[in-house]
Swiss-Prot record:
Zn(2+) binds at residues 117, 121, 127. This is Endoribonuclease YbeY. The keyword Ion transport does not apply. Binds 1 zinc ion. It holds the Pfam family YbeY. The gene is ybeY. It comes from Azorhizobium caulinodans (strain ATCC 43989 / DSM 5975 / JCM 20966 / LMG 6465 / NBRC 14845 / NCIMB 13405 / ORS 571).
Length: 159
């Protein structure tokens, strides 16, 4: 399994181990799927900024605003062709940091969650309806728990 990380935005230096966090999260997501991951699978993760992800979001989703993560699954190749590209996950720094602050999470944990989320999208998970969302969120919770990260969907405790 090859996972390439490109850090496009220097601001990610505020989280010095961002590339390692992203790789660990993607590996955990893929490991959770076992045999569903094709032999020779590879993917890329791009750590970018809000300006770049806004352009991509506008181009590919007709939404002219930044978002936290985008996933671009690769076209399927015949079985046995190696390498098997899974696709690309792109994460926006400013949105990750602002959401983490608003949700009382660490940026590292939020980044890991978004990479897990994006990687699951590459593997065919979706959240277009309630059943799909429940299945995807359950998978995310399990994967993140294995990384020592609390349930990202839990409401903060009042107090």
């Amino acid at each position: 399994m090859e996972i390439d990380v490109l850090v496009e935005d220097d601001g990610w230096s505020a989280l010095p181990d961002a590339a390692e966090i992203a790789i660990a999260a993607a590996r955990a997501a893929l490991a959770s799927l076992g045999d569903e991951v094709p032999e020779g699978a590879e993917m890329s993760i791009t750590l970018t900024d809000d300006a770049r992800i806004r352009v991509l979001n506008r181009e590919w989703r007709d939404k002219d605003k930044p978002t936290n993560v985008l996933s671009f699954p690769a076209a399927e190749l015949p079985e046995g062709v190696v390498p098997q590209p899974l696709g690309d996950v792109i994460v926006a720094r400013e949105t990750v940091f602002s959401e983490a602050l608003a949700e009382d999470k660490t940026p590292a944990h939020h980044l890991a969650h978004l990479v897990v989320h994006g990687t699951l999208h590459l593997m065919g998970f979706d959240h277009e309806d309630d059943d799909e969302a429940e299945e995807m969120e359950a998978a995310e919770r399990q994967i993140l728990a294995g990384l020592g990260i609390d349930d990202p969907y839990a409401l903060p405790a009042e107090g």
